[in-house]
UniProtKB/Swiss-Prot annotation:
The keyword Coiled coil does not apply. It comes from Thiobacillus denitrificans (strain ATCC 25259 / T1). One of its GO terms (molecular function) is metal ion binding. The gene is mraY. GO terms for biological process: cell division; cell wall organization; peptidoglycan biosynthetic process; regulation of cell shape. It comes from the Bacteria. This is Phospho-N-acetylmuramoyl-pentapeptide-transferase. Its cofactor is Mg(2+). The lineage of its organism: Bacteria, Pseudomonadati, Pseudomonadota, Betaproteobacteria, Nitrosomonadales.
C-alpha cells in the first residue's frame, strides 16, 4: 500500500525511491509491527480481562502453574493484526507469496481462535476436537502445497536442498513435494503450539527464526546474492522478508507482555498461526531442513510428546515426568525462568547454525 504510494511519488520526487529498497522496508516493517503491538497491547489485555477470556490450567501439571489460571489468553490475535496491517502497508501487494503467507497466517489463526474460544466457553484445556483441528490444518496445508507445486516456474523451486553441501539437491515428485510441504506447515504449526506452555518460551524462538528466514528470503529473492551463496533463486521471494520482519517485530513487542510473569498468553490463535507462517516461508525459499534445525526447540518439544505417548501406549510407562519436555524440567526442580532462558539459548545457537549454512557449503 505505502510502497505503491511512494512509487507514484517517486516519479516526481526521487527521494521517495529509497522505499524501493527491500532492506529499508523490512526494517520499517519490524518497527511498525513493534509500535502497533506496543500501543495496542495494553488495551487488548484490558479488553480480554474485562471479557474474562482467561486461561484454563491443567490440574495435573506443575503446581506453580495454578496461579496462572485466569490470565488473559488469545493475545496472539494482537500479533496477527500487527503482522497483517504491517505487511499490507510495506509489502508489494502484487506479490503472490505475500498473500499466500498472509492467508496461511490468518487461516491457521482462525483455527486457533476457535480452539481458544472453546476452551474459554467450556472452561477446560481441551478446546476444539483434535480431529477437526487437524482436518482444517490439513485442508489449508494441502491447498498451499498444491498451489506452490502448480505455480513453480523452475525445477529448483520444487527441489529439496541439503544444507552445508554444495549443490546437493534432490528433485521431488508432485506427491513428495506436496507431502513435504504439508508436513512442514502443519508440523511447524503444532510444534510451536506445543512449546507455548511457559511465559515467553515460544515467542522469542519464533522471533529468532522469523528474523533468520527474513535473511533467507532476501537472499533467495536476489539473483546475485542467491547465486553467490548457492541458494535457489526464487523471484519474488524477497518480499517475504517484509512479512518475516513484521512477525519478528510484533513478536518482540508481544514478549514485553508475555515475559514472566505473563500479563497475557498467546493462545492457539497465535501459536498455530505463527508456526504455519514459518513453515510456508521456509518452503517458498526452499529451506525446509534449515527450518528443522533452527526450530530445534520446537522439534524437541514435539518429539517429547510423541515419545511419551508411544511409550505409555506400548509399555504403560512414561519416559518423562511430564510432556512436553519443558514441564519435565520443571518437575525436576528447574525454575520456570531457568527453563525458558536455557531453551532460548539453545534456540539462538540453532538459528546461528542455520544461518551459517549460507556460507558453509
Amino acid at each position: 500500500m505505502l510502497l505503491w504510494l511512494f512509487q507514484q511519488l517517486g516519479e516526481d520526487i526521487r527521494a521517495f525511491n529509497v522505499f524501493n529498497y527491500l532492506t529499508l522496508r523490512a526494517v520499517l516493517a519490524a518497527l511498525t509491527a513493534l509500535t502497533i503491538s506496543f500501543i495496542v497491547g495494553p488495551a487488548v489485555i484490558r479488553k480480554l480481562t474485562a471479557l474474562k477470556i482467561g486461561q484454563s490450567v491443567r490440574s495435573d501439571g506443575p503446581q506453580t502453574h495454578l496461579v496462572k489460571a485466569g490470565t488473559p489468553t488469545m493475545g496472539g490475535a494482537l500479533i496477527l493484526v500487527s503482522v497483517a496491517v504491517t505487511t499490507l502497508l510495506w509489502a508489494d501487494l502484487s506479490n503472490d507469496y505475500v498473500w499466500l503467507a498472509l492467508m496461511t497466517l490468518l487461516g491457521f489463526g482462525v483455527i486457533g481462535w476457535v480452539d481458544d474460544w472453546r476452551k474459554v466457553v467450556e472452561k477446560n484445556s481441551r478446546g476444539l476436537a483434535s480431529r477437526w483441528k487437524y482436518f482444517w490444518q490439513s485442508a489449508i496445508g494441502l491447498v498451499v502445497a498444491v498451489y506452490l507445486w502448480q505455480t513453480a516456474s523452475l525445477p529448483a523451486h520444487t527441489e529439496l536442498i541439503i544444507p552445508f553441501l554444495k549443490q546437493a539437491t534432490f528433485g521431488l515428485s508432485a506427491a513428495a513435494f506436496i507431502a513435504l510441504t504439508y508436513f512442514v506447515i502443519v508440523g511447524a504449526s503444532n510444534a510451536v503450539n506445543l512449546t507455548d506452555g511457559l511465559d515467553g518460551l515460544a515467542i522469542l524462538p519464533t522471533v529468532m527464526v522469523a528474523s533468520a528466514l527474513a535473511i533467507f528470503a532476501y537472499v533467495a529473492g536476489n539473483a546475485v546474492f542467491s547465486k553467490y551463496l548457492g541458494v535457489p533463486f526464487v523471484p519474488g521471494a524477497g518480499e517475504l522478508a517484509i512479512f518475516c520482519a513484521a512477525m519478528a517485530g510484533a513478536g518482540l513487542a508481544f514478549l514485553w507482555f508475555n515475559a514472566y510473569p505473563a500479563e497475557v498468553f498467546m493462545g492457539d490463535v497465535g501459536a498455530l498461526a505463527l508456526g504455519a507462517a514459518l513453515g510456508v516461508v521456509a518452503v517458498v525459499v526452499r529451506q525446509e531442513i534449515i527450518l528443522f534445525i533452527m526450530c530445534g526447540v520446537f522439534v524437541m518439544e514435539t518429539l517429547s510428546v510423541m515419545i511419551q505417548v508411544a511409550s505409555f501406549k506400548l509399555t504403560g510407562k512414561r519416559v518423562f515426568r511430564m510432556a512436553p519436555i519443558h514441564h519435565h524440567y520443571e518437575l525436576k526442580g528447574w525454575k520456570e525462568n531457568q527453563v525458558v532462558v536455557r531453551f532460548w539459548i539453545i534456540s539462538m545457537m540453532l538459528v546461528l547454525i542455520g544461518l551459517s549454512s549460507l556460507k558453509l557449503r
